[in-house]
């Protein structure tokens, strides 16, 4: 949902992370890792390889400038699932090939071909198989009829804060309600 580093609420600037690595090395840190959280629920096959390239280049730069022993790079999540009918699902094989390509182009020539890569693909792996179960907790009849549920903006802040797409409705038969 966010994909501009200047808008990210987490993390450090390039200058800050370089300084942080230097400080940590001076205090005795021997191994380092890099982690990113830049976007959520991207529905493009290009995002993850692009993020990998940025992080891999950052890792090489940090190794060269600070001498840090970078053991892992966590690409975080971000690979989304289609919520809207007009959205195509991501091609996880194309994404994997893209990440492998930049790994081999950036990290391997820099002598960093042993850096572990981590991902956090919970939404991609589990999202299509889950369901939201909610309970009607009150009814309001004014000019229209409303049903209040226990899964509203107070309970589900992502749609309210980031404009995430709402869930689809499953229509139940009368005897199932």
PLM regions and their residue ranges:
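Flexible, glycine/charged-enriched surface loops at secondary-structure junctions
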Residues: 65-72, 109-118
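Active-site-proximal beta-alpha core segment in soluble small-molecule metabolic enzymes
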Residues: 1-72, 81, 102, 137-140
